[in-house]
């Protein structure tokens, strides 16, 4: 099993969710994140004072997948979140040794 994690622009969440739903993903976790990559941040002037905004708002999307589904899900997330501009985000996968559905006690792929 794989845990696919994406840190992407907040405005891309709906496109990602729709793409994953169309692929057949039944669940995902979304949380707020802040950070920067190559684009760093920006300077904003508010009421005459300069402010450095160096941690930009992002979202973190996590999906558990079978090994067979992982590459396809990765492709769906990339296609749904790509704008071609700096700040589009990152996507990575990690091996998961065990998953358990708390309600039923199902383990492994059955818990996904």
Q: Where are the regions a protein language model picked out?
A:
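Positively charged, small/polar-rich N-terminal and surface patches that mediate targeting and assembly
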Residues: 1-112
